[in-house]
Amino acid sequence: RVTFRQADACALPADLLDFDAVLLANLLCRLPSPAACLGRLDGDRGLVKPGGIVVVVSPYTWMERFTPREVWLGGYQDDEGREHYSEEGLQAALGKNFDLLDKHDMPLLIREHERKYQYIVSQAMVFRRRL
């Protein structure tokens, strides 16, 4: 049995909880607050029930017009020149309550018009919420 729901990823309704699986596809780097979305995945009123799966697919193309730089999960150098990678930021954000099961690249082709296409390689990561 499958239920599909659509809502604002940064302000999800309180009645959304205990799903077996949640898919976050190509939206994380377009949210004004990725932490608000990710923080809603677990806890007493978590979207994902214990033992459930989260699939996050993202190209990590952070842009300040969508997401303030100070809340990016990665994709930048800090003032001391250290690289911060989105993959590591995502794992850190979910790591205390989720185990990484799999990750791989997922190519994507977007047709803008008959003569222009965008080729993008997103990263797909699969996590399981700890019991």
Describe every region a protein language model picked out.
Residues A35-P50:
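A short glycine-rich, Lys/Arg-flanked "PGG" loop and its adjoining helix->strand segment in the class I
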Residues R1-L12:
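S-adenosyl-L-methionine
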Residues N26-R30:
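Short catalytic micro-motifs in class I SAM-dependent methyltransferases
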Residues G51-P59:
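Conserved beta-strand signature within the Rossmann-like core of class I S-adenosyl-L-methionine
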Residues L23:
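A conserved beta-strand element that flanks and buttresses the S-adenosyl-L-methionine
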Residues D18-D20:
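Conserved acidic residues
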